[in-house]
Structures are given as C-alpha cells and as structure tokens.
C-alpha cells in the first residue's frame, strides 16, 4: 500500500491549488481526478474574478492550469475513490481494488 503525505480529491481550481501548495512544501501527493481537469472551468466563456488572470476564457484558464501543474511535475491519478476510511493518524483511500494511505 502506497503512503502519501496528502491525498487531494478533485482537479478543479481548489484541488489544483492544494496540490501546488503541497508540492511547494515537498509533500508526497496523491492527486485524484480527471486529467482533463474540471469541465466547468473549460465551459466558462469569460472568467472575471480569478486573481492574476483578468478576463480569461475558461479554455485558456484550463491550459494555464495544465501548464503550471506540468511545470511542477504534479501527476494526476485518474482513479475513482470508492471509500475513505479514518485510520487514526491517517486515512485509508480505496480506489477499486487498490488502497492508499494519506
């Protein structure tokens, strides 16, 4: 069973931001979600309220997110989470027949 410092479920803006923050702090990350990121971001015609990216299209924002996580060498694991078990000081994460700890 693989052990991680942190498991993040979801590849929307909040999940990616959490993954970047954890990576900068040299944590071993399990980022679970779609490698295509959030469809909601890409569908946005124009995003007006994202700091540093004024009036950006959702498609351009998605590309900026993808470029940033690639530069930081963050891997997205495309597995469905079935169950999360509290295990005292860590959590067990079941993904099909696989388990991980974080």
Kindly label every feature range from the protein language model.
Residues 2-4, 95-102:
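Core beta-strand elements of the Rossmann-like FAD/NAD(P) dinucleotide-binding domain
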Residues 42-99:
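N-terminal Rossmann-like dinucleotide/flavin-binding domain of flavoprotein oxidoreductases
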Residues 12-17, 60:
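Gly/Ser/Thr-rich beta-alpha loop segments that engage phosphate groups in nucleotides
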Residues 1-14:
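Beta1/beta-strand and adjacent pyrophosphate-binding region of the FAD-binding site
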Residues 19, 23:
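Gly/Ala-rich phosphate-binding loop of Rossmann-like dinucleotide-binding domains
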